[in-house]
Amino acid sequence: MTTKQWGITPPISTAPATEQENALNTALINELKNQNLFESPAESEKRVKVLDELQQITTEFVKKVSLAKHMNEKMANEAGGKIFTYGSYRLGVYGPGSDIDTLVVVPKHVSRDNFFQDLEPMLREREEVTDLAAVPDAYVPIIKFKFLGISIDLIFARLSVPRVPRDLELSDNNLLKGVEERCVLSLNGTRVTDQILQLVPNRAVFKHALRAIKFWAQRRAIYANVVGFPGGVAWAMMVARICQLYPNAVSSVIVAKFFRILHQWNWPQPILLKPIEDGPLQVRIWNPKLYPSDKAHRMPIITPAYPSMCATHNITLSTQTIILREMVRAGEIADQIMVKALPWSALFQKHDFFHRYKHYLTITAAAKTAEAQLKWAGLVESKLRHLVTRLELVDAIALAHPFNKGFDKVYNCSSEEEAQQVASGVTLEVAYESTDHEKLANDTVNEEKADNTESKADGSENGEKQIFPVYTTTCYIGLELEKKKGHPIKRLDISWPTQEFYELCKKWDKYDDTLMNVFIKNTKNTALPDEVFEPGEERPKATKKRSTADTAHSTEQLKRQKVSTA
């Protein structure tokens, strides 16, 4: 009897788990529980309730639009509309506080404009909905909100069909006919997730292994598609491929094999869960023989659903180097764990990013309103990888390491002049409060509700001084400099990469120089701000200066590197 082949190659091993591997698997699951990665049954039931409510709202939304477009009651009721999930929730690897990636699928007579003009107000009217922020001009437009305290990211797709019944499934490629590209991308979130689950030998093994790998990647700060690291779908496909190669293994073995196999992988050979398939659309499918840009992908991980795309096109030379270094480190730890020389907790130690380098670039996006900052900070963050690739071309820089998330602040300034200085990168003793994107969403709502009446120059009616807020998001890039024995770095000129980055950001068609700015500074590790460290974490200490004149000159040149806010 032949064993079923999972994936495009035969398995490496079909051996069942040993007693020790089973014991290590139990220990792994216990460690994941200790790390609070599993949600309580009550919270999971609450998510189901929220999705049921969203389905009802979607049905009402489609009916409302249908009636407005002169359909009769029967046709409007039959038009349907359906909610799908994708990402970690659909994969079954969500945890406490995770958002739900959600897709609303509608028939052809319901437009994207209706999504924002009709569905968004319907959501705002619900008392269960808070922190709602719409981003209609994103490439994949989205509405973010909380429903009964659960974060929802809601995207939109319109099919070229007159009705979307509740029993509709998205697996049929023909459903993509006549659908615009942005909707294909949205639909493929669900389609890819479903295919990943269909292409693994054992879903329970896959899910536990994926929870472990995702948590490891987050702890090591290498989980963020936007800045050049794999995102959730890419990590899921990598884990799925290892499951295919070891179809009878338990999760502990999958995790241990994961690091060694992927570090030794013959990149840029792609990771595929199944052969790339053709389909009914005249659309681009990943093909490095046909497209030079596809050939340039360093660690291609290809989505299984038609049309196949590369989920890791953002990876740069630097981020690839960092990923592979982390896999070597993790592989060595996993080897020790598998012989019971170390506990699983050793694998999940926090990153040392803010201790690893001597010099960092701080990239700060600033705006004078919360609404502007939500969009502007997202735009600047999306361009960071382009700054990384330009820094990689500087002779003196061996590696440019972007941190995987930004840090948000609100500076409360006492005058317009002070606010302008803060937004331009001038360091002032200004009161600030920590914030996050949820607070920005709240502030955006508050701004919309605020009176448009002109404030008095000396402040509000109750005598309080007027506050001029400046919202900032700061991202970090660690610089690893070239180490050439006997040839110390005499000058580090990053004016060209930074100027190109400024120009790239400010080409955005929504850029407003009266509201927004971006600036870059060089910061030594000893001068990093408190918010990048956890409470009680030891900060980097200044090292004793070496006596060589060249080394001193090199440090001074970097210190003096002036990066304008052009």
Swiss-Prot record:
It is found in: Nucleus. Its EC number is 2.7.7.19. Binds 2 magnesium ions. Also active with manganese. Keywords: ATP-binding, Magnesium, Manganese, Metal-binding, mRNA processing, Nucleotide-binding, Nucleus, RNA-binding, Transferase. Mg(2+) 1 binds at D99, D101. GO terms for molecular function: ATP binding; metal ion binding; poly(A) RNA polymerase activity; RNA binding. GO terms for biological process: co-transcriptional mRNA 3'-end processing, cleavage and polyadenylation pathway; nuclear mRNA surveillance of meiosis-specific transcripts. It is an enzyme of class 2 (transferase). ATP binds at Y86, G87, S88, D99, I100, D101, D153, K214, Y223, G232, V233. One of its GO terms (cellular component) is Mei2 nuclear dot complex. The keyword Mitochondrion does not apply. Mg(2+) 2 binds at D99, D101, D153. It catalyses: RNA(n) + ATP = RNA(n)-3'-adenine ribonucleotide + diphosphate. Its cofactor is Mg(2+); Mn(2+). Its main location: nucleus. Residues 437-463, 530-566 are annotated as: Disordered. It holds the Pfam family PAP_central. The record marks K144, H313, N314, R385, E500 as: Interaction with RNA. PANTHER family: POLY A POLYMERASE (PTHR10682), POLYNUCLEOTIDE ADENYLYLTRANSFERASE (PTHR10682:SF10). Belongs to the poly(A) polymerase family. Polymerase that creates the 3'-poly(A) tail of mRNA's. May acquire specificity through interaction with a cleavage and polyadenylation factor (CF I). This is Poly(A) polymerase pla1. It comes from Schizosaccharomyces pombe (strain 972 / ATCC 24843) (Fission yeast).
